[in-house]
């Protein structure tokens, strides 16, 4: 194989609870991650040596700051490969949006180069390497619906729930740093401690898992939770405004994804999602909207099916 094309799907967080801090500086979390059909498209082509990365979005770095570039470097080092690769990223997932766009691209490079270079790594081996680059990348490799614990790299697949309509909303000129959001949450928890004002009762992980097991959209909507909203919403008022706007437009439930600023609404139907998108576009002219759906997988290798061995 000399070249391949991959579809790298975005993710949303249906549930994100921060349990505490870890000695390694990360946060201990419990999350439910869900792939959606909004996706980047990557083209990989063999070259004699070196890594050359291009992207159709000028704001995306094309050097070692890019996770996709780092993924190729990591495989070269760990597999003692002198082979090179040309990587082109066609971006559709917004940058710094809480949708794991960079992580999905890195996952696609790991999957694609495993095929292109004939490395024969299992999914489990790829996910172990992926965890060294970022906490969302192991999930992005397989995708679907999964419970993530630890710092997000310990995964437990849940029953796939395909086709649930989702409406995404992201302020065009706003990005939120994941590192800032987690640090702000830790600082808030340390400062407030036991004196923190009582919060309204938050959904729990068992409630979210029960809704998923029953495949009950209204119950899922009631169990949506993202602890990072506690620091992002006070800092960026537009995020809270968009959450409320999605609910007013008919969403069963609405939540910020990851560290934001993207918010999503679980919609009753694709038709209502499209109607809400058109209405909200007139109301929020500096916000991008996408209608999408839950997806059952993460990385899709085209045109041939992925031949990774299960771990």
Swiss-Prot record:
It comes from the Bacteria. The active site is at 11, 136. Pathway: Isoprenoid biosynthesis; isopentenyl diphosphate biosynthesis via DXP pathway; isopentenyl diphosphate from 1-deoxy-D-xylulose 5-phosphate: step 3/6. InterPro entries: GHMP_kinase_C_dom, GHMP_kinase_C_sf, GHMP_kinase_N_dom, IspE, Ribosomal_Su5_D2-typ_SF, Ribsml_uS5_D2-typ_fold_subgr. ATP binds at residues 94-104. GO terms for biological process: isopentenyl diphosphate biosynthetic process, methylerythritol 4-phosphate pathway; terpenoid biosynthetic process. This is 4-diphosphocytidyl-2-C-methyl-D-erythritol kinase. It comes from Synechococcus sp. (strain JA-2-3B'a(2-13)). The lineage of its organism: Bacteria, Bacillati, Cyanobacteriota, Cyanophyceae, Synechococcales.
């Amino acid at each position: 194989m000399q070249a391949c094309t991959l579809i790298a799907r975005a993710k949303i967080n249906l549930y994100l609870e921060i349990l505490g801090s870890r000695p390694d500086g990360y946060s201990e979390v419990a999350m439910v991650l869900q792939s959606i059909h909004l996706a980047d498209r990557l083209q990989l082509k063999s070259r004699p040596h070196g890594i050359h990365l291009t992207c159709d979005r000028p704001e995306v770095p094309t050097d070692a700051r890019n996770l996709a570039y780092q993924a190729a470097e990591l495989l070269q080092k760990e597999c003692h490969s002198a082979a090179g690769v040309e990587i082109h990223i066609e971006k559709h997932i917004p940058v710094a949006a809480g949708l794991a766009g960079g992580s999905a691209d890195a996952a696609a490079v790991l999957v694609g180069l495993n095929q292109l270079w004939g490395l024969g790594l299992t999914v489990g081996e790829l996910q172990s390497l992926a965890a060294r680059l970022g906490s969302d990348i192991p999930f992005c490799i397989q995708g679907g619906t999964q419970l993530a614990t630890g710092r997000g790299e310990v995964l437990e697949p849940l029953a796939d729930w395909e086709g649930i309509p989702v409406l995404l909303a992201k302020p065009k000129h706003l990005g939120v740093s994941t590192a800032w959001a987690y640090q702000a949450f830790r600082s808030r928890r340390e400062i407030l401690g036991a004196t923190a004002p009582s919060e309204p009762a938050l959904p729990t992980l068992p409630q979210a898992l029960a809704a998923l097991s029953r495949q009950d959209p209204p119950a899922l909507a009631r169990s949506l939770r993202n602890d990072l909203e506690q620091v992002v919403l006070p800092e960026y008022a537009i995020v809270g405004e968009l959450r409320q706007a999605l609910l007013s437009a008919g969403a069963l439930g609405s939540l910020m994804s990851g560290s934001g600023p993207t918010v999503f609404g679980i919609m009753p139907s694709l038709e209502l999602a499209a109607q809400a998108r058109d209405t909200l576009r007139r109301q929020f002219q500096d916000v991008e909207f996408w209608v999408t759906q839950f997806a059952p997988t993460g990385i899709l290798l085209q045109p041939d099916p992925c031949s990774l061995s299960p771990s």
